[in-house]
């Protein structure tokens, strides 16, 4: 079977379209300094820490600010935006989800991301592109793509009766409650470990190949259906701060075409600190 939507481009396609009018490349990395060490010619940088988040509240910038951001990057409304980055496109997927949620269309991801481009020895530059600012039109959020804490809590009933599914895309040790964060990552202040009751643990990396590309549609379908996460269910995905769950959201909604998939961006850093929220913990030190 083919992917449900035409949302991926190959590194070869990207190399052939670096100078194509109406095609714009945006790099989004976990390591926000990586872009300066070399990037695709013509690509602009999106900093997930400063560009997408509200400077004070734990929330995103408003749609008007998204329009201003894209305008500052020289993006036009009818441009095809190709996102790519490090970590098998973690943060490129996060930006894809956020921009889709904000009402932006014509989005694609470069399959394999930065690591595949570099591994193939393709052209890189440290030169920042010259950008002519544009006026990007007004945007409207699609709230059907985002899950909030109270919605997640209400969703537990749907999970229990088999109409909904909850996907925890973190590592097995995070899921069990043995640890509250990934190895070699800072502790982000989560007071409790474990997972949301009823969640299925399907680590994000199971959807990728060693070169950072996504697995085939047939493999992805078997992966999720094998855990009872089927297209007829209302699905919510979460991780720690929503970058890994954005990757899984992209797989489920864009590559497999599941109609109802939401990303819980509060994820474990909200749920694990929430007073009175139910938690399952399967790890025991005994």
UniProtKB/Swiss-Prot annotation:
Sequence ranges assigned to domain Rhodanese in this UniProt record: 19-126, 160-280
Entry keyword Magnesium: no
Cell compartments where the protein resides: Cytoplasm
Keyword vocabulary terms for this entry: Cytoplasm, Repeat, Transferase
GO CC annotations on file: cytoplasm
First-listed, main subcellular location of the protein, grouped into a coarse class: cytoplasm
Pfam families membership: Rhodanese
A single GO molecular function term of this UniProt record: thiosulfate-cyanide sulfurtransferase activity
PANTHER family: THIOSULFATE SULFURTRANSFERASE
Protein name as it appears in the record: Thiosulfate sulfurtransferase
The organism of origin for this protein: Deinococcus radiodurans (strain ATCC 13939 / DSM 20539 / JCM 16871 / CCUG 27074 / LMG 4051 / NBRC 15346 / NCIMB 9279 / VKM B-1422 / R1)
Taxonomic path: Bacteria, Thermotogati, Deinococcota, Deinococci, Deinococcales
